[in-house]
């Protein structure tokens, strides 16, 4: 498809909208929506009404529940940029609260070591990190495999608590005693992570 013209838009024209989401990435998305909607003839009031009615989507900083004062989030982030933007947004939404990142290398991107350094740096933005085994590891040539143990070792060198655990139960056994009221636990996976969200909430409800 060929574009016959290019238009440039100034930021002030599309600033000042209120959106019910946190994070710079969501603000940029909202600005792009406002540009498109304006081109389609919608007024500023109509655009704002649309933002006001938007409640977000599942698996994007989705609150799965709260127990014992701990908030458990689910997020689909499975590449370094998404992890960075989401952890920053969590800190914006939940200021002065500890953020724990639980990461499952399950997507084709995160199972491979092409982003080993970037994934490590992204997760290190959290206050504590748990990484589980690489999904379907045997399908990958050894030289392409992500090394979660090395990720954890590097994060520890930065002074952050980090642990590699083979499965969800092992993570929960280690993590649950460390949690305190006000903590935020963010689960990052493009899969179900062995139901870790509900299992964590169940454990916390018994504390």
Task: Give the label of every model feature segment.
Residues 1-2:
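Short, small-residue-biased leader/transition segments that mark boundaries at the very start
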Residues 6-11:
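Conformationally flexible catalytic loops at phosphate/diphosphate-handling active centers
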Residues 13-15:
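The feature captures the short pre-catalytic strand/loop hairpin that immediately precedes
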Residues 17-24:
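A short glycine-threonine-serine/GTX helix/turn-capping micro-motif
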Residues 25, 32-207:
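ATP-dependent carboxylate-amine ligase
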């Amino acid at each position: 498809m060929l574009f016959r013209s290019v238009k440039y838009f100034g930021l002030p024209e599309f600033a000042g909208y209120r959106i019910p989401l946190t994070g710079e990435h969501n603000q940029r998305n909202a600005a792009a929506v406002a540009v498109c909607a304006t081109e389609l003839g919608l007024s500023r009031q109509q655009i704002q009404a649309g933002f006001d009615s938007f409640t977000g989507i599942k698996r994007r900083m989705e609150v799965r529940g709260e127990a014992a004062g701990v908030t458990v989030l689910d997020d689909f982030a499975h590449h370094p940029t998404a992890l960075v933007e989401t952890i920053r947004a969590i800190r914006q939404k939940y200021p002065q609260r500890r953020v724990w990142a639980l990461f499952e290398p399950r997507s084709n991107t995160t199972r491979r070591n092409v982003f080993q350094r970037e994934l490590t740096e992204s997760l290190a933005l959290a206050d504590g990190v748990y990484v589980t085994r690489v999904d379907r590891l045997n399908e990958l040539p050894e030289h392409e495999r992500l090394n979660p143990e090395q990720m954890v070792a590097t994060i520890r060198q930065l002074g952050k608590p980090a642990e590699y655990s083979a499965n969800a139960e092992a993570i929960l056994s280690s993590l649950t005693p460390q949690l305190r009221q006000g903590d935020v636990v963010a689960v990052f996976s493009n899969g179900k992570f062995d139901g870790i969200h509900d299992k964590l909430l169940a454990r916390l409800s018994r504390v």
